Amino acid sequence: MNRFNPFLGNIDELFKTSEGEKKEYVHPALKNLGSVSLVLIREAIAPVVFRNSEEEITDIEINQGEGNSDLYVRAVPNKFKYPERGRGLQILRLFKAGGKMPQNKIILTKKMKPSDGFDLNSLVFGDSTVWDSNVLPVKAAVNYSDALSVLPKHFCVDATFHHRAFEDGTLFDAESKKNSDNLFNRHFVKPGTLLVQVLSTRGRLLPQMGLDHLLLSIGIAGTYGGQTSVTGTNIRTHIAGIYGGRFEQPETSPYQIVRALANHNNLEAPLFQNVDQLTAHLHETLNKVHEVSMTAQEVRDYQGQLMQRFESDFQSMEADYREAADKIADFFDKWFMGDKADKKAK
């Protein structure tokens, strides 16, 4: 993982002090050239529901050139970011290194400090709150892209017909003395569907500790989308590779990946259904256009080491998290409070 250090931030240099008109002030470290992208393959292992107010699965039309276009399943970033951000909070709570407040509901009183609400999760996934009439914005160091199916939508979705019965198992409403007309379709993404998503960090804002925390938060499998009580764990996540360089490359956009795959002659080829073949195809393309890379197997091994350490070397990892928590707390307090942070610490 050290190969990506030239494109990542430094947890000991999260902020910088500059000279203002009247006095010095603290602000986040200035951005520098550097980009790291995690290319993920999200595999549906049970029915998944990605929808808005309509019952149909969300989609987007992608132009494939020469006047051709098709609809693809589209899961917007928050469908995956929300549960993984939540898992990150749970990890911090276990280590007593953050996660003091619920996700999306940080409330700071005047007597509290920004670090009472902001933590490593805030640095990685972003956060915001209002404190003493000021809006405190923390931009995410990691950006989630849309997740797009590698095959057109009509290959990937299906629907089942349902009715909402009463407790006695019938459709007769005892109150109204009528039959229930509460009938509906449930559209879902079929098991076996593969979606591509890219998580990227730019400007050297994410420290190594943040990347490790992200890998733990992503995990291996989880429950995603709406109406998930129906299917439970429904997504297995595969990291196809990690790629770094001074500049971002257009080839890492999931839209570009899908456009390139659309030119394949046979949409029923194993490439669209087999994670290993798709992973190899993506790595062959992306490795050429980046300065450094880590293969899927290398990432699996590294992620496995993190998981193993989490389970068997808990105290050591807890110490690392708490040390990082102190540095991040100092960063947020000095950024948003300035000199008041030192006075409040005393």
PLM regions: where:
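RNA-binding basic/glycine-rich loop and surface signature characteristic of RAMP-family CRISPR effectors
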Residues: M1-K346
